[in-house]
Regions:
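Blade-level signature of beta-propeller repeat domains, shared across WD40, Kelch, NHL, RCC1
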Residues: 381-390, 394-420
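Beta-rich, blade/repeat-based domains predominating
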Residues: 61, 65, 102-124, 159-173, ...
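Short loop/turn segments immediately following beta-strands, especially the blade-tip
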Residues: 85-92, 144-149, 189-196, 244-252, ...
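C-terminal region of N-terminal signal peptides and the immediate post-cleavage residues
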Residues: 48-68, 75-76, 250-252
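Short loop/turn segments immediately following the C-termini of beta-strands
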Residues: 75-77, 87, 136, 179-181, ...
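Beta-propeller fold detector
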Residues: 93-103, 152-158, 196-207, 253-261, ...
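Secretory targeting and sorting signals
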Residues: 4, 25-58
Length: 420
């Protein structure tokens, strides 16, 4: 008895547990993402958001779209939430409300600090003015319309698979990466009424995970190349970087991805340089970054061999101008990198640390960069905090703020952050 993946309807009942774009600015597109399986691919909830906010007069946001905002995904198992913050011109954060997503958070098996074990679980899309969040524990994706720092018009749809953990956006198209089971990517159209399933877009990743995957065998991220011609997925357990060449209509041009062996061990996060022509992949095994060219046919060319930062367990990577910042969860540090005009990547200093580590900033995970590339925000899962840093002219980071009382890593923990 078959299942139509794109309509979401099945002739047999599901036996799963389910009940129901970038953390930072990306070059050559207007999408920001925040880091982290399913039933019918149709809207399953559209309700008034439960929210605690200050009066509207206290917000500096514009009438449409996000403005001076940072969003943090709580990823709570009993009900996922988005914590909104107003961002001052000096980078300091003030709480601006907590919003229920209408889905549940998730926790991958044996995850050490990062419950979703991914990058890109929370995405703000400038073009549509929408914030997109995964609900890993209920196999759904939530969209909100953003006004300033406020979230409105919640819509919830099935992710099309098990344990959604990453979202990519290009133009009017979004793809969700499902980490559980065989793993998959599922496409959606971004509309004024939320996400609509894109017929014919579902593609399997051919993995062999449980519905709730192990953190070290789950895929790490899905992302579009800035020109939209390729959709890229990292797989930690298979040690591959897999690419789907895309058609202009937003559908994959191939039934199966082009599989490239990773130059470094355990590929995790994806980022691109300011030109959009070079792809950087963070690799957790030896805390390295490899620079690639993504060819139109999906094959990768190594432009620079893995560069080690001397830290422990690099998993997340974001760009601010010609600088890149990586989160090392093994020893709770942030590394800085700089790319010269020839595309050569190097560390910003000899020790590989962009800012001094802090006892109150433990369990470094996901990062976000503001659209003006002046500030970097870092999640500390063990401490339950977010640190904000000013980007200095030499690439060093100066701490300007700390947001506290966020969900601390335990049975699960926060993961996913976006900055505007």
């Amino acid at each position: 008895m078959g299942t139509d993946r794109d309509s979401g309807y099945s002739e047999h009942g599901r036996t799963s547990r389910h009940s129901g774009t970038r953390r930072g600015h990306r070059a050559k597109r207007r999408t920001r993402r925040i880091v982290l399986g399913g039933g019918a691919l149709a809207t399953v909830a559209a309700a008034t958001v439960a929210v605690t906010v200050a009066s509207a007069g206290q917000y500096s946001g514009s009438a449409a779209g996000a403005d001076h905002a940072v969003f943090v995904q709580g990823n709570e198992l009993d009900g996922n939430t988005i914590h909104a913050f107003a961002r001052g011109d000096d980078g300091k954060l003030k709480p601006a409300g907590t919003y229920e997503t209408g889905g549940k958070g998730g926790d991958q098996i044996d995850a050490p600090t990062d419950s979703l074990a991914s990058q890109g679980s929370l995405v703000y899309d400038d073009r549509s003015g929408m914030l997109l969040a995964v609900n890993a524990g209920s196999g759904t994706v939530t969209s909100f319309r953003v006004e300033g720092q406020r979230l409105k018009d919640r819509k919830v749809v099935s992710s099309g698979g098990e344990f959604p953990s990453s979202i990519a956006v290009h133009g009017k198209t979004a793809y969700v990466m499902n980490a559980g089971g065989e793993g998959s990517v599922q496409g959606f159209r971004i509309t004024g009424k939320g996400l609509k399933p894109l017929k014919g877009s579902y593609r399997s990743l051919g993995l062999d995970n449980e519905d709730i995957p192990r953190f070290d065998t789950s895929p790490g991220e899905v992302d579009f190349t800035p020109d939209g011609r390729n959709l890229v997925v990292t797989t930690k357990g298979n040690n591959t970087v897999e690419v789907f060449p895309m058609k202009r209509n937003g559908l994959p041009a191939v039934a199966e991805p082009v599989v490239n062996e990773s130059a470094g061990g355990v590929p995790f996060a994806i980022s691109f340089d300011a030109t959009g022509k070079r792809m950087l992949v963070a690799e957790a095994e030896k805390s390295t970054v490899t620079t690639y060219k993504v060819n139109r046919d999906g094959k990768l060319k190594v432009l620079q061999q893995p560069l080690a930062n001397g830290q422990e367990t690099l998993c997340w990577l974001e760009r601010a101008g010609n600088y890149f910042y990586g989160g090392n969860t093994g020893n709770s540090t942030v590394s800085g990198y700089v790319m010269d005009k020839h595309g050569k990547l190097s560390l910003t200093n000899d020790v590989g640390i962009a800012t001094p580590p802090s006892a109150n900033s433990q369990g470094v995970i996901d990062l976000a960069v503001t659209e003006d590339e002046k500030f970097v925000y870092v999640q500390n899962a063990v401490s339950g905090t977010v640190d904000g840093f000013r980007v200095e002219s030499d690439g060093a980071l100066t701490k300007v703020t700390t947001a506290e009382d966020l969900p601390v890593f335990g049975e699960s923990g926060m993961e996913g952050i976006a900055a505007v």
